[in-house]
Amino acid sequence: MTTSWSDRLQNAADMPANMDKHALKKYRREAYHRVFVNRSLAMEKIKCFGFDMDYTLAVYKSPEYESLGFELTVERLVSIGYPQELLSFAYDSTFPTRGLVFDTLYGNLLKVDAYGNLLVCAHGFNFIRGPETREQYPNKFIQRDDTERFYILNTLFNLPETYLLACLVDFFTNCPRYTSCETGFKDGDLFMSYRSMFQDVRDAVDWVHYKGSLKEKTVENLEKYVVKDGKLPLLLSRMKEVGKVFLATNSDYKYTDKIMTYLFDFPHGPKPGSSHRPWQSYFDLILVDARKPLFFGEGTVLRQVDTKTGKLKIGTYTGPLQHGIVYSGGSSDTVCDLLGAKGKDILYIGDHIFGDILKSKKRQGWRTFLVIPELAQELHVWTDKSSLFEELQSLDIFLAELYKHLDSSSNERPDISSIQRRIKKVTHDMDMCYGMMGSLFRSGSRQTLFASQVMRYADLYAASFINLLYYPFSYLFRAAHVLMPHESTVEHTHVDINEMESPLATRNRTSVDFKDTDYKRHQLTRSISEIKPPNLFPLAPQEITHCHDEDDDEEEEEEE
């Protein structure tokens, strides 16, 4: 007879983790199939699965798609008067990464941490360090909330733009026809500030996306630019069996239809042998022209799309949800009303940390799944270059050994210069494994602004949402403990506390003291017999009262 889990939980010795120190690892999926957890999420509570299209359902091939966007933007700049020489530039995917900040005053690309501390500074293709950096950033720090000056390049669509900004700054700084200035460049009596140059690039990028030929060229060669995954119909059909599925994209219907038709263009349906189904059949609700992030606030007028012509029908749609109907505009409130769902019932899956994740989380309370395609390469470096990480750990041990027997009475000063140089060299080698700007998530031991945003706003994240295929819909995604240095570097072993060295250590706050202190408290209050407050002292909770991030708030309410 098999022992049930509830019985095994009664005996800690039978817990799987106690059978083997590293037992948890054998229960984990393969790294490239994993979904990573910032906040616990019970999948069985999710009633609706929402999707963005661009870079989520439709993953664009890299660097082919970025190269196309780069070329079209350069052509647009040349057409409005920028030098012909710019046409010689080609997109280099090894340079940019997401999450960089462009300083519109000095023309620098900056990689910063969550607090605005500089991690990397590049002026064009020139990486600036030390005293040169401090001339422009005295404390190696920026005010991130100065959005007039600093622009965060957070999206995958920003990658070509990021590299183009570096190309332009480098060109105008080094081309002998122009005179480089601190905040821009001169051509004779004409001055162009980096702020003006940046605005020209922003306008050119928007023109390429909304008025130019980017979408036209994409649909002309979908096989070249769009990833097609045979597991997509299977996952969406399984989602539809356990809940409702909706699409909310900023793209117009004609483009959406062509992309989605290609993604579901298989001779079979969800499984080999099943009949082919049109892409619309996999969704309960389809919204185009969503205009996110406005969609998560006041939104826009909800209208109905004529799928034969792609044009919008006049008037605001006010009826119930109809299967097979495509809607334009609307808002996140519209989604909740039409699907009969509320905030935490919905898991929204997207790639845009601001337009998809931050706004859906902060304004609607939707659960969030961030798609980070770069994670596949980040994991490859993390595992393939493990020797570099191990060497850094060894160097830390060498440092600890040098200081092991020294305290404040020691006059000895160990020479750690060679170890410091080696740490810098290994850290640099590790950074370069990711690309010229280093990892998307860190610079050495410090996490980037992008990493902090992922941890703050994304409940779940993965290289692809297809990874949900490898988990049951009853799965509890449980967040790991986020350890502080005093927790991650101190072993779980008993330590005898010296009360003289640490007087506050005697301030034992655990409930085991309560019985002992009852008598002391009685001694303090025994003379007060006539008038007493309703409760003289707090009592230790006998039931769970703290929020432990187990995604079980509703279950607790039901139990009450």
UniProtKB/Swiss-Prot annotation:
Residues 541-560 are annotated as: Disordered. InterPro entries: HAD-like_sf (IPR036412), HAD-SF_hydro_IG_5-nucl (IPR008380), HAD_sf (IPR023214), Pur_nucleotidase (IPR016695). Residues 550-560 have a biased composition (Acidic residues). This is Cytosolic purine 5'-nucleotidase. It holds the Pfam family 5_nucleotid. It comes from the Eukaryota. Homotetramer. It comes from Bos taurus. The gene is NT5C2. PANTHER family: 5'-NUCLEOTIDASE DOMAIN-CONTAINING (PTHR12103), CYTOSOLIC PURINE 5'-NUCLEOTIDASE (PTHR12103:SF17). Its cofactor is Mg(2+). Mg(2+) binds at residues 52, 54, 351. ATP binds at residues 144, 154, 453, 456. Keywords: Allosteric enzyme, ATP-binding, Cytoplasm, Hydrolase, Magnesium, Metal-binding, Nucleotide metabolism, Nucleotide-binding, Phosphoprotein, Transferase. The modification Phosphoserine is found at residues 418, 502, 511, 527. Binds 1 Mg(2+) ion per subunit.
